[in-house]
């Protein structure tokens, strides 16, 4: 039986029809929003999602390197290296990237949320944010297991450094916060420094920005 979520993503994506001087032109809803410089990061962070996100970031930079990009995040997290590919691209490109959590930003999702441009990191009131240390498993020879364990420790240290950079918290505070699954409300994430504001509606004087 086909996964209902997979069915939704593949068959029920709305289309938008616009009138142009050359007649009608149709877009799927996500492509239309991409024209407005809006990127969606939804679902698990893995190589396929990461590749699409990086490609969209690079495309929007090429389109206009001075205009901000809005990234909407609703993700349970996923593969660390896939998330770091998105993170590095966000830091690499010229446009400022605004982030907004809708639903949840857990694990790597929370890191991408806090990686947005300073003063441009937001969450909706009922969003949930979760931070924790990386996890992994490996089978094989003892030496290989030890090497993989060391790599996980290296990744843990690097992720902690990223959280320190973007939250302004000390390394000790970050290590304590990430020791176990740490679930936060939007307000708690604001107090911790993961985001800059909790918003419940668009500013009345600017409806053009996505966040």
Curated annotation (Swiss-Prot):
Identify the EC number(s).
3.4.21.92
Report the gene name.
clpP
Which enzyme class? hydrolase
What the entry lists under PANTHER family is as follows: ATP-DEPENDENT CLP PROTEASE PROTEOLYTIC SUBUNIT
What's the short name of a Pfam family annotated to this entry?
CLP_protease
Species of origin reads Xanthobacter autotrophicus (strain ATCC BAA-1158 / Py2)
Recite the UniProt keywords alphabetically.
Cytoplasm, Hydrolase, Protease, Serine protease
Provide the family line.
Belongs to the peptidase S14 family.
What role is this protein assigned? Cleaves peptides in various proteins in a process that requires ATP hydrolysis. Has a chymotrypsin-like activity. Plays a major role in the degradation of misfolded proteins.
Q: Name one GO biological process term.
A: protein quality control for misfolded or incompletely synthesized proteins
The record's Gene Ontology cellular component field reads: cytoplasm; endopeptidase Clp complex
Q: What is this protein called?
A: ATP-dependent Clp protease proteolytic subunit
Checking InterPro entries in the record gives:
ClpP, ClpP/crotonase-like_dom_sf, ClpP/TepA, ClpP_His_AS, ClpP_Ser_AS
Localization per record = Cytoplasm
Chemical reaction(s) catalysed: Hydrolysis of proteins to small peptides in the presence of ATP and magnesium. alpha-casein is the usual test substrate. In the absence of ATP, only oligopeptides shorter than five residues are hydrolyzed (such as succinyl-Leu-Tyr-|-NHMec, and Leu-Tyr-Leu-|-Tyr-Trp, in which cleavage of the -Tyr-|-Leu- and -Tyr-|-Trp bonds also occurs)
What GO molecular functions are on record for this protein? ATP-dependent peptidase activity; ATPase binding; serine-type endopeptidase activity
> Where is the catalytic site?
107, 132
Q: Which HAMAP family does the record associate with it?
A: ClpP (MF_00444)
Self-association state and partner proteins as the record states: Fourteen ClpP subunits assemble into 2 heptameric rings which stack back to back to give a disk-like structure with a central cavity, resembling the structure of eukaryotic proteasomes.
Q: What is the predominant subcellular site recorded for this chain?
A: cytoplasm
